[in-house]
């Protein structure tokens, strides 16, 4: 337990330089891009006096040197102040937090749907290796991996919302019903990828000596499958889930934009479009934290499931 605690502490400390490095790079890239946030704000208001533009730029601190701007933002971050949105004039932290429930709901539903679909089908395909079921599921996996998410989203919207009128076209991010189409869109793509990986992992395990030996001793295949093979395959499944959870918690920009799902992905797209620097930086910090924490939890689960896998802690 002591080593595990030390490892967790070490990884959390590593989060600090990671966040600093990523935020500095994103801050620099936004400035290098040359776009003017103030001009974006006044772009649809016709001719605006240069004095007004200069005053707004000074108010936002955009007339300061790059390092001064970054230092000011970093100082605010360390005191819990992520600034004010250039576009809405609202507190960035409060706005960002208000979008998290919609993203969390979509993440949970998508992961549940993916697990329910991909793991049983992947195992089934492996057990029925080189039979009709296997060929059919492999075709489904290939098709799901080939179709872009936006195409699947538009197809589902056309069928379920416009043609059959079963589900709302525009999601409001507050009900399960409005989450069905974006969840299906994400689950189809992830299930196609996961099913192929689960099939390959389970098939590899089924051909190992301990499984063949159990079969020779008369142990039922179903018993070996559920007690040994699936447990050995869990590391691969956990890796896939961890990667997907990280990206989903960051918001899926295209899907959220298509379905008008009011989550952090759509918020990030809108912020980038309007050059809302404080909001973009908040999103960058969120993504950095999420990926470090997801990787940390994954490493710990690896160690719990298979103690032979050593954590990155020096022997005492």
Task: List each model region and its residues.
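Membrane-interfacial helix-loop-helix junctions in multi-pass membrane proteins
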Residues: 57-66, 82-92, 174, 272-278
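Membrane-water interface segments at transmembrane-helix boundaries in multipass membrane proteins
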Residues: 89, 138-200
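Cytoplasmic-entry segments and transmembrane alpha-helices of multi-pass inner-membrane transporters
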Residues: 2-14, 120-156, 235
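Individual transmembrane alpha-helix segments
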Residues: 66-109
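Hydrophobic alpha-helical transmembrane segments of membrane transport/permease proteins
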Residues: 18-71, 165-181
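Alpha-helical transmembrane segments of integral membrane proteins
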Residues: 2-5, 96, 100-133, 172-316
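Transmembrane helix irregularities
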Residues: 33, 144-147, 249
């Amino acid at each position: 337990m002591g080593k595990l605690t030390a490892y967790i502490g070490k990884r959390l400390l590593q989060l600090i330089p990671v966040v600093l490095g990523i935020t500095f790079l994103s801050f620099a890239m936004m400035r290098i891009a040359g776009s003017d946030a103030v001009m974006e704000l006044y772009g649809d208001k016709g001719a605006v006096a240069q004095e007004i533009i200069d005053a707004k730029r000074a108010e936002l601190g955009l007339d300061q040197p790059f390092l001064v701007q970054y230092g000011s933002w970093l100082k605010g971050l360390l005191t819990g102040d992520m600034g004010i949105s250039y576009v809405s004039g609202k507190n960035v932290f409060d706005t960002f937090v208000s979008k998290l429930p919609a993203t969390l709901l979509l993440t949970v539903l998508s992961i549940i749907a993916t697990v329910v679909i991909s793991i049983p089908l992947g195992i089934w395909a492996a057990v029925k290796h080189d039979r009709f079921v296997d060929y059919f599921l492999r075709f489904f996996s290939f098709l799901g991996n080939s179709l872009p998410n936006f195409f699947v989203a538009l197809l589902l919207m056309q069928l379920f919302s416009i043609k059959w009128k079963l589900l709302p076209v525009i999601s409001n991010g507050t009900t399960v019903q409005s989450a069905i189409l974006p969840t299906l869109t994400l689950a189809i793509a992830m299930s196609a990828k996961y099913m192929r990986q689960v099939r390959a992992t389970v098939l590899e395990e089924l051909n190992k000596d301990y499984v063949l030996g159990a079969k020779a001793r008369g142990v039922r295949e179903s018993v070996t499958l559920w007690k040994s093979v699936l447990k050995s395959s869990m590391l691969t499944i956990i890796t896939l889930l961890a990667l997907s959870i990280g990206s989903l918690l960051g918001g899926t920009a295209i899907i959220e934009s298509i379905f008008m799902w009011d989550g952090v992905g759509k918020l990030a797209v809108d912020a980038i479009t309007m050059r809302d620097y404080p909001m973009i930086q908040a999103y960058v910090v969120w993504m950095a934290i999420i990926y470090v924490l997801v990787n940390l939890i994954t490493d710990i689960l690896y160690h719990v499931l298979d103690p032979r896998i050593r954590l990155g802690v020096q022997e005492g």
